[in-house]
Amino acid sequence: MGKIEVINHPLIQHKLSILRRTDTSTKAFRELVDEIAMLMGYEVLRDLPLEDVEIETPITKTVQKQLAGKKLAIVPILRAGIGMVDGLLSLVPAAKVGHIGMYRDEETLQPVEYLVKLPEDIDQRQIFVVDPMLATGGSAILAVDSLKKRGASNIKFVCLVSAPEGVKALQEAHPDVEIFTAALDERLNEHGYIVPGLGDAGDRLFGTK
């Protein structure tokens, strides 16, 4: 079974509580998603490799550490995943950004893929798939399927809120993909929404339905 990490930092949990509220404005929702993604990034990026580098301070020459230049890619699942990109890019600005577009069929609750735009060397990159919600797991599974078909193998999934059903589905389909989430909620309701959740993240991010 794949690994899941729930990031319980007090700042993340505080901001997530505001994010969930019905009366949080579109502007505030957008800003909070960006901030939470950035804060989660410290844990998500914890295992990036380092290398020695010789530098000169105002006092002396010294050997210090820097990122080893591993190629990274942030891949949002459209459309809601877009809201998490800038927060992570603020930490790793050299990362490439791909896009996987999906929408959910409201009758079957199954994802339908309509766009895949990825860096040409995606198979050589460490990939962070981002989507605010991990509900049924269908979109996450399809996104990882698309990446693996193109040779990708080092993939992590980053979300703000997850449901046990979605976590289980993604772990069973792709046990090699580590999941990072700010909250593991109670369950899905009959419409496939996370309870207590935060509603439709895409609608709330962009102010459209």
From Swiss-Prot:
Domain of life according to the entry: Bacteria
Cofactor: how bound: Binds 1 Mg(2+) ion per subunit. The magnesium is bound as Mg-PRPP.
Catalytic activity: UMP + diphosphate = 5-phospho-alpha-D-ribose 1-diphosphate + uracil
Gene Ontology annotations for the cellular component aspect, listed alphabetically: cytoplasm
Pathway where this protein functions: Pyrimidine metabolism; UMP biosynthesis via salvage pathway; UMP from uracil: step 1/1
Regulation: Allosterically activated by GTP.
Enzyme class (EC, first level): transferase
Family: Belongs to the UPRTase family.
Function comment: Catalyzes the conversion of uracil and 5-phospho-alpha-D-ribose 1-diphosphate (PRPP) to UMP and diphosphate.
Protein name: Uracil phosphoribosyltransferase
